[in-house]
């Protein structure tokens, strides 16, 4: 096994390199993403071959006086999410910062976010988890604040306040875990059997704090209001990372606490109900949006709510469905934000009321967007179908016939998305004329994401065989 | 490495360095201004810090004349505060009143020395008094404009001293040696001792800036020149905290539990909550960056009180860690404020576009503020984590929760400044003088390095805490 | 030969035509590549049908989740699969051939043919599916290609709108179908049709979850097979190119729903859900037939007629008359494809005019006219066209149920009426552009467009022989009634549209009413605005949540603001506060000690 800390050291080295060789920012960030992807594919491949179900942990001395170690662990969940994150990061860096000059800053932030995302997904204890969680929040903050569009200031403000509120809750929970766990351990995976020895009310408190913290990040109704602003005002690359990877931080955390904390079972029904409400709520809310990036942002809430629902089923297949759903949603939402960014770049406009007949002059982007809708509505042979299958089988297993209800929010989602695309993309009577060309690099981004969507959609066993042995 | 102590008996080395520094500065008052003198003075401060750290490394300890004692605690804090004082001195090397500054700073160093190495309560009061008087004169040396803040500081300092002396007087019958290591037990006169404790608390609360004893702080900080604000927030206050640790944790350590709880813990519990909320809530609405940092430093003091209130080894470790951490953060921040002040940039609005005018300053200030807000992996987070943990450890979950709420509130005003700095404004670039840049860079780098690997500072803090409690 | 090879030529042909279509020089060959692919698939299909022993099919493991839950792709080659395969195998190359003549702008051909090839491939996949996973993959493929093809002419006003309507209905159906599939899986742990049928057949009482699942599947099927209340998308779908209407929206894709219901009919019967099929089938066929009588759109009349036909198929299924449904399934596909091709030829000659009062008659092209009449009599159910047998079998199946029988007989009359209205009105009509130009256009119609029609007309007639050969007993009474009703309909049409100078029917209130499509579209609009209203409500809730957060933040800022006065610069205040603090500390002392 290679040292996992390489996954943090490599991007850090590239971070330093970009800070020095400012002119090569984009190339370096792409290379960094490629290097990360190669490493993860290597780990992924070797776990797939060895078929080992165990969580691999590596520890370094960190704060001996508190008994906190710098523990890095790779579980099957984290491998899948790492894979997703590196594909998105590669597409993000490769497609470049369309139309903005601050490419160095953008590349720096992408690499910083890469550190955060990798670190979070391989963190073996909650202390490390928290550290990388906040790194993962700070990088997108600047992506919104510095590189964003017109309302970036308010959006970034909202973003940072909500996210750090979430991290404040997380910190409280972590401190509680630290002091109530036998032997003062924070190790995420070995805590699994230890929660039950804590008093019930402490377990409930810890669970609630974790839940609300992750819920803000995911996000779920009623703590979702930061998301549409943040995701729509960020730069294209920022939106891709935010929706594609950052929301998965919460999903990852949710998976961890639901799998490891037995107390979750007493909340799961209410949480599933909340997730269902959240999906429908966001679907209706989406219909009032006219800004194409805001629309895509709202789909994130819907899909993440469905993923939350899947986790709340507390069945093995539900967890797998959630994991696959995160993989699917990460890839597709990055694709759609990239397409939306391409449209914004080409037409200098995001209002779907104004945009007309985009497919006339931007065929590629229009069809990419369409495929994105297909994936979101669960087209077979794409990742969306596999995740829908798994999620709702889990739902029915856990909640019987009611387990199918959230699926119907996809009618609203797809119905509205098709309305948008047919009004603004595929009605060419009076097409809007573009003022700029789509950079070739963006097409490379499309290609990477589309390819991954179809690979994981047609060959889902690549991922599922790994997860089948053990979800953790 | 036995060569160094052999060459120069360490317990004499520090007083010697300080004496040399004072004599040297007094002499330079008589001569013409020379840049080199500044360099020598900075070097002397640096040597003092280094010697202290070497003593720490050598686990040197001992008692002299029943006034001073050396142990890990005193060595760590003197070394760190001397280092901080060196940074502040570095800020002033180009100022026009540098001659006076040099002398007064060496007096401050003397004060730090007395307080850190105090064995007797008398050493503490001498040290504190020296620091305050020197600071008053530093403010005054900047011109007539600064009489008002200097007088305010002087008055409050005098009141503080008065309270301190009164507390001392009450204590005298029960602790005639005035040694801080005398354990005060709850025997006869426990109410008198308690009263003395309260008076000590009030006296030190004035200087550490605990609510409601701290109303003067924003006023004086804002009124004084930036470099002296950095000194007050970075050094003076921290010296007072050292005194707090010595008096309350060492001297009153066995003044034990009473019916409703430990008096020391209760006092600092209340002070901590009030102070955190007071500082943060007012900082929220500040338009002037300097005032904002003044209030912010008040709230940061509240976090240090959390560890003192916990009164456990972990809490003291956290407090010591955070004293040093905050010193670094606030000196760095006020250095930038000081420099921008000299460019007539004071309000948050005027900070707009700082990223384009001087990217280094903007990035450094951002990192420092994020650290103050407790964002990992920066030094502030490590400190806060230990402080909040210690609160939970001693069953004060409420205190931890309030601390976390306050760090969250503080995000609001720090983000406001960050938000401004990274906006696009068409303004000319401004150059940062090399000495200020050096101070900022040192602070920022330490904030990051210790943040990423807190053990560098936590290890010594742990040793120091072991001596205190 | 693996069963999946059947779709391979289509995929290759589609890909080739897409690539050729992008290339400036290759554009011209795009259509031929696609046609070759379709023909290849068709030949393979016919070989497979001729030598079924050669085929390999069964289950392919696709993926496994959660350790044990497997998702296999199953295939089957039963009689209903073969029926659908034959239909697709016959019609698909003819449509591609027809398209060569019809789609004569080269610019967009690559896109058109790749979508059409994907559609045909999905159709074959559907036909050979033996389990729900395979079925659903094909099902979604049909939906999406249909959506793309309806909206093919993006530069016009109506197609994007029609495509949206279609896809919205299709999405609703997809979700219902998927829900049903998953609910069935949850009860039986299998996706395989045969296993599901035997498992449910063995149950004494069908559990509620399976009834719900079947209902969801039936309604899912209704969306694709354009049953009331989901039928309106089909009439709008006529905005697509005519070959698409002939292929997707009359003969094949709309049969997908019928197909799945036929497969599941044993368990639907077992679950006592036949009445759903019957009721909705009757409503749909009435709505379809009357709307067809009201419309003046050349293709929409045929579309409503398709809706009616599909309704009739569900009626037959609701009566548990599978063989009648399957027979009608076959003949309807042939004559409806024929009629659509015919309509397309008329449009082509009349510059895409679609109003039956504006187009000039196709009687000027005798061949076209002849095949049109064959199609029309087949639709009307007149011997010797094969449509007669389809209708006859359904009518006979209904003979035990008087109400249904009467309704069907009335519908026979209406069918004869509207299809001959469709045929008669354009006859002798000069048209806007003058007769000479129109005649030239008619005679210039591409052979590629005529050949498929002739073939289909021949099949429509030849099937009659097959029926005569295969049917052992028919109810003479039903045959007489059917023929009488249809002839009466034709007669009414003749009297109204050929002899009477003032056009009574066209100006009548009832026609106006019928042309409004029973306000189904209006109902859709109400539902849509209902959803929009909910969305507005939700938006205001969201605003309230946002405001709540803002108010909270404001409150905190206000506290800060009110506390700011403490730092007023007066030393007295500071000292006073200090004194208060001291008192406070003493109070703590007193309290603690």
Predicted segments — roles?
Chain A
Residues 134:
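Short phosphate-coordinating micro-motif centered on Lys-Gly-acidic
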Residues 93-97, 115-127, 140-389, 393-423, ...:
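Hydrophobic transmembrane alpha-helices and their helix-loop junctions in integral membrane proteins
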Residues 1-6, 13-108, 189, 468:
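Transmembrane helix-loop-helix hairpins at membrane boundaries of multipass inner-membrane proteins
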Residues 8, 12, 30-40, 86-87, ...:
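Alpha-helical transmembrane segments
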Residues 362-364, 417-472:
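Cytoplasmic/organellar membrane-interface segments at the starts of transmembrane helices
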Residues 38-41, 114-118, 307, 455:
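Aromatic-anchored segments of alpha-helical transmembrane domains
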Residues 31-47, 163-174, 449-458:
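Hydrophobic alpha-helical membrane-insertion segments
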Residues 23-35, 154-164, 362-366, 442-447:
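Alpha-helical transmembrane segments and their helix-start/interface "positive-inside/aromatic belt" motifs
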């Amino acid at each position: 096994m290679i040292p996992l800390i390489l996954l943090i050291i490599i991007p850090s080295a590239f971070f330093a390199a970009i800070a020095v060789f400012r002119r090569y920012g984009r190339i370096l960030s792409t290379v960094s993403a490629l290097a990360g992807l190669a490493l993860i594919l290597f780990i992924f491949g070797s776990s797939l071959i060895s078929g080992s179900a165990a969580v691999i942990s590596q520890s370094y001395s960190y704060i001996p006086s508190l008994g906190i170690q710098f523990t890095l662990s790779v579980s099957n969940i984290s491998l899948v999410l790492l894979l997703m994150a590196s594909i998105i990061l590669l597409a993000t860096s490769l497609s470049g910062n369309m139309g903005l000059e601050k490419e160095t800053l953008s590349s720096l932030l992408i690499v910083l976010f890469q550190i955060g995302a990798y670190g979070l997904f391989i963190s073996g204890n909650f202390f490390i988890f928290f550290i990388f969680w906040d790194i993962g929040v700070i990088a997108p903050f600047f992506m919104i604040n510095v590189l964003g569009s017109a309302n970036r200031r308010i959006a970034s403000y909202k973003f940072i306040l909500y996210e750090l509120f979430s991290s404040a809750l997380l910190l409280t929970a972590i401190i509680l875990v630290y002091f109530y766990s036998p032997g003062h351990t924070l190790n995420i995976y070995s805590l699994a059997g230890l929660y039950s020895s804590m008093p019930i009310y402490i377990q409930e408190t810890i669970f609630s704090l974790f839940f609300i913290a992750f819920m803000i990040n995911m996000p779920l109704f009623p703590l979702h209001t930061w998301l549409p602003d943040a995701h729509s005002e960020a730069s294209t690359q920022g939106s891709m990372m935010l929706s594609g990877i950052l929301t998965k931080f919460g999903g990852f955390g949710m998976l961890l606490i639901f799998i490891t904390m037995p107390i979750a079972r007493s909340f799961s029904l209410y949480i599933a109900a909340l997730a269902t409400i959240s999906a429908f709520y966001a679907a209706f809310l989406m219909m009032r949006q006219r800004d194409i990036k805001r629309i895509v942002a709202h789909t994130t809430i819907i899909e993440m709510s469905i993923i939350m629902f899947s986790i709340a089923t507390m069945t093995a297949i539900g967890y797998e469905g959630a994991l696959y759903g995160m993989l699917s949603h990460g890839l597709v939402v990055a694709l759609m934000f990239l397409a939306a960014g391409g449209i914004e770049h080409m037409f200098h406009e995001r209002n779907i009321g104004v945009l007309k007949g985009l497919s006339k002059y931007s065929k590629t982007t229009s069809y990419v967007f369409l495929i994105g809708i297909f994936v979101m509505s669960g087209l077979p042979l794409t990742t969306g179908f596999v995740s829908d299958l798994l999620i709702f089988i889990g739902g029915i297993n856990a909640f019987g016939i009611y387990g199918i209800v959230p699926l119907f929010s996809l009618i609203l989602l797809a119905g509205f998305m098709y309305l948008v695309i047919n009004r603004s993309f595929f009605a060419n009577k009076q097409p809007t004329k573009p003022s700029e060309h789509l950079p070739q690099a963006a097409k490379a981004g499309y290609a990477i994401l589309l390819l991954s969507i179809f690979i994981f959609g047609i060959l889902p066993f690549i991922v599922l065989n790994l997860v089948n042995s053990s979800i953790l | 490495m036995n060569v160094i102590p052999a060459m120069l008996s360490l317990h004499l080395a520090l007083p010697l360095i300080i004496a040399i520094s004072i004599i040297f500065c007094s002499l330079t008052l008589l001569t013409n201004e020379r840049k080199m003198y500044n360099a020598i003075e900075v070097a002397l401060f640096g040597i003092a810090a280094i010697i202290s750290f070497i003593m720490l490394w050598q686990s040197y300890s001992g008692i002299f004349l029943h006034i001073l004692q050396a142990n890990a605690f005193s060595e760590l804090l003197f070394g760190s505060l001397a280092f901080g004082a060196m940074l502040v001195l570095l800020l002033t090397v180009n100022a026009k009143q540098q001659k006076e500054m040099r002398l007064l700073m060496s007096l401050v160093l003397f004060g730090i020395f007395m307080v850190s190495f105090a064995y007797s309560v008398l050493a503490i009061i001498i040290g504190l008094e020296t620091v305050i008087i020197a600071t008053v004169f530093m403010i005054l040396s900047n011109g007539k404009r600064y009489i008002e803040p200097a007088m305010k500081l002087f008055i409050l300092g005098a009141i503080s001293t008065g309270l301190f002396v009164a507390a001392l007087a009450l204590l005298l019958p029960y602790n005639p040696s005035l040694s801080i290591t005398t354990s005060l037990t709850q025997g006869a006169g426990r109410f008198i001792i308690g009263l003395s404790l309260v008076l000590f608390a009030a006296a030190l609360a004035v200087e550490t800036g605990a609510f409601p004893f701290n109303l003067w702080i924003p006023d004086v900080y804002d009124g004084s020149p930036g470099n002296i604000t950095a000194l007050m927030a970075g050094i003076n206050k921290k010296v007072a905290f050292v005194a707090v640790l010595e008096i309350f944790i060492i001297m009153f350590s066995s003044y034990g539990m009473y019916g409703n709880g430990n008096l020391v813990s209760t006092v600092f519990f209340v002070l901590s909550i009030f102070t955190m909320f007071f500082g943060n809530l007012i900082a929220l609405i500040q338009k002037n960056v300097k005032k904002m940092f003044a209030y912010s430093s008040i709230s940061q003091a509240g976090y240090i009180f959390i560890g003192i209130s916990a009164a456990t080894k972990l809490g003291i470790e956290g407090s010591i860690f955070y004293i040093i951490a905050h010193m670094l953060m606030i000196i760095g921040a006020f250095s930038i404020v000081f420099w921008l002040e000299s460019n007539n940039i004071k309000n948050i609005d005027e900070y707009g576009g700082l990223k384009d005018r001087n990217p280094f300053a903007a990035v450094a200030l951002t990192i420092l503020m994020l650290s103050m807000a407790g964002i990992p992996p920066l030094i502030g987070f490590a400190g806060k984590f230990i402080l909040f943990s210690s609160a939970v450890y001693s069953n004060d979950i409420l205190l931890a929760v309030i601390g976390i709420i306050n760090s969250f509130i503080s995000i609001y005003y720090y983000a406001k400044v960050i938000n401004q700095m990274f906006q696009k404004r068409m303004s000319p670039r401004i150059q940062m003088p090399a000495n200020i840049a050096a101070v900022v860079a040192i602070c920022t780098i330490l904030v990051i390095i210790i943040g990423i690997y807190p053990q560098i500072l936590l290890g010594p803090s742990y040793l120091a805490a072991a001596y205190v409690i | 030969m693996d069963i999946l090879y059947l779709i391979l030529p289509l995929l290759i042909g589609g890909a080739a035509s897409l690539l050729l279509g992008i290339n400036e020089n290759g554009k011209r060959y795009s259509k031929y590549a696609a046609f070759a692919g379709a023909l290849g698939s068709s030949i393979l299909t016919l070989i497979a049908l001729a030598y079924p022993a050669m085929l390999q099919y069964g289950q392919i493991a696709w993926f496994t989740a959660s350790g044990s839950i497997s998702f296999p792709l199953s295939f089957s080659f039963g009689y209903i699969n073969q029926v659908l395969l034959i239909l697709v195998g016959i019609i698909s190359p003819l449509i591609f051939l027809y398209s060569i003549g019809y789609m004569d702008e080269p610019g967009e051909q690559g896109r058109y043919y790749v979508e059409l090839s994907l559609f045909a491939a999905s159709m074959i996949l559907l036909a050979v599916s033996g389990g729900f996973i395979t079925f659903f993959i094909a099902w979604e493929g049909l939906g999406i290609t249909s959506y793309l093809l309806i909206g093919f002419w993006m530069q016009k006003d109506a197609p994007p709108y029609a495509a949206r309507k279609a896809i919205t209905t299709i999405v609703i159906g997809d979700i219902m179908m998927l829900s049903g599939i998953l609910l069935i899986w949850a009860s039986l742990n299998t996706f395989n049709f045969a296993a599901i049928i035997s498992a449910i057949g063995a149950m004494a009482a069908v559990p509620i979850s399976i009834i719900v699942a079947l209902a969801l599947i039936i309604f899912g099927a209704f969306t694709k097979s354009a049953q009331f209340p989901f039928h309106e998308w089909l009439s709008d779908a006529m905005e697509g190119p005519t070959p698409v209407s002939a292929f997707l929206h009359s003969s094949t894709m709309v049969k997908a729903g019928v197909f799945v219901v036929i497969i599941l009919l044993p368990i639907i019967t077992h679950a006592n859900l036949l009445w759903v099929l019957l009721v909705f089938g009757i409503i749909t066929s009435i709505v379809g037939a009357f709307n067809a009588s009201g419309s003046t759109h050349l293709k929409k009349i045929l579309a409503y007629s398709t809706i009616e036909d599909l309704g009739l198929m569900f009626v037959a299924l609701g009566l548990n008359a599978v063989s009648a449904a399957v027979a009608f399934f076959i003949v309807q596909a042939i004559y409806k494809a024929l009629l659509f091709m015919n309509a397309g030829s008329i449009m082509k000659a009349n510059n895409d005019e679609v109003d039956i009062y504006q187009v000039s008659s196709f009687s000027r092209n005798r061949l076209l006219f002849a095949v049109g009449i064959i199609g029309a009599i087949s639709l009307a159910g007149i011997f010797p066209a094969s449509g007669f047998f389809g209708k006859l079998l359904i009518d006979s199946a209904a003979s035990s149920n008087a109400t249904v029988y009467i309704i069907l007989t009335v519908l026979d009359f209406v069918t004869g009426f509207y299809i001959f209205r469709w045929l008669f009105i354009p006859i002798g009509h000069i048209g806007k552009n003058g007769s000479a130009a129109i005649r030239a256009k008619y005679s210039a119609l591409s052979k590629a467009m005529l050949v498929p029609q002739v073939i289909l007309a021949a099949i429509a007639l030849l099937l009659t022989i097959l029926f005569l050969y295969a049917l052992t007993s028919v109810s003479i009474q039903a045959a007489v009634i059917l023929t009488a009703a249809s002839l009466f309909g034709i007669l009414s049409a003749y009297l109204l549209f050929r002899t009477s100078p003032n056009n009574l029917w066209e100006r009548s209130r009832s026609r106006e009413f019928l042309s409004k499509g029973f306000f189904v579209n209006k109902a859709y609009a109400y539902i849509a605005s209902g959803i929009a209203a909910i969305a507005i409500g939700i938006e205001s809730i969201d605003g309230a949540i946002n405001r709540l957060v803002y108010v909270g933040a404001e409150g905190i800022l206000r506290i800060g603001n009110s506390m700011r006065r403490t730092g007023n610069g007066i030393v007295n205040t500071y000292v006073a506060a200090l004194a208060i603090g001291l008192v406070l500390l003493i109070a703590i002392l007193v309290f603690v000690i």
